[in-house]
Amino acid sequence: MMKLVIILIVLLLVSFAAY
């Protein structure tokens, strides 16, 4: 369950970095 939360956070960070 925690892994899903971590993955979502990582995706958000990547999206901000790509922006």
Swiss-Prot record:
Record GO cellular component, one term: membrane
Keywords assigned: Membrane, Toxin-antitoxin system, Transmembrane, Transmembrane helix
Coarse class of the protein's main subcellular location: membrane
Signal peptide range: none
Residue ranges of the TM segments: 4-18
Short name of one Pfam family: Ibs_toxin
Location of the protein in the cell: Membrane
Keyword Membrane: yes
Expression induction: The sibD sRNA probably represses expression of ibsD mRNA, either by destabilizing the transcript and/or preventing its translation. Expression of the proteinaceous toxin is controlled by antisense sRNA SibD.
Annotated knockout phenotype: None seen. An isbD overproducing strain cannot be made in the absence of the sibD gene.
InterPro entries found in the cross-reference section: Toxin_Ibs
Topology within the bilayer: Single-pass membrane protein
Role: Toxic component of a type I toxin-antitoxin (TA) system.
Family stated for the protein in its record: Belongs to the Ibs toxic protein family.
More details: Part of the SIBd repeat region (formerly known as QUAD1d), encoded on the opposite strand from the sibD (formerly known as rygD) RNA.
Protein name: Small toxic protein IbsD
Protein species of origin: Escherichia coli (strain K12)
